[in-house]
Amino acid sequence: LRVHFPLNKELVKAVEGVSFSINQGETLAVVGESGSGKSVTAMSILRLNDMAGAEMPTGSIKLRLKNNEVVDMFETSEKDLVNIRGNHVSMIFQEPMTCLNPVLTVGLQISEAIMIHQGLNEEKARDKTLEMLNLVRIPDPNKVINSYPHHFSGGMRQRVMIAMALSCRPQLLIADEPTT
């Protein structure tokens, strides 16, 4: 994998020649100094660097979907990426406050992801949301489901993001800075 960002008529080589393979049930930790490309690598798997101004990464990211179909994330259409993100691959971002919508309740945000990716109706998605909030040990999920992100500490917002990421049972879970 190679990812370059244009900067002042030059290219910054954010990731240069990273290669790894992850099989079902395995855990992989990517470690390195600050600025070494760990987050860029993680974002590349979901093709989120496209939105951050990166040139199209080179290399390939092959993903075996739940139906055993193998796709190359760099050759996948935007429409198919919507299905893959969340349903097959989820990411827990480093800073939950930048990922959670401040004007929507956390319950609605988790439920929407479930309805989009699992096709559940509103009532069943709400039940699944409560189940996920319980799973990540958020106290009083029936109250929390109607609360807004700014009502929570950073650690509780992180748990909300974990609940959302796990809600669709992805095959690959990416955690950016999981220990912060």
Feature map (PLM): residue ranges:
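Conserved ABC ATPase "signature" region
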Residues: K62, K124-K143
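ABC ATPase NBD Q-loop/coupling interface
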Residues: P6, S60-N83, N121
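Hydrophobic anchor residue at the start of the ABC signature
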Residues: I110, I162
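A short, proline-enriched helix->beta-strand linker immediately N-terminal to the Walker B motif
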Residues: S167-Q171
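Conserved ABC ATPase signature
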Residues: S147-F152, M156
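Catalytic Walker B motif of ABC-type/P-loop ATPase nucleotide-binding domains
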Residues: L173-D176
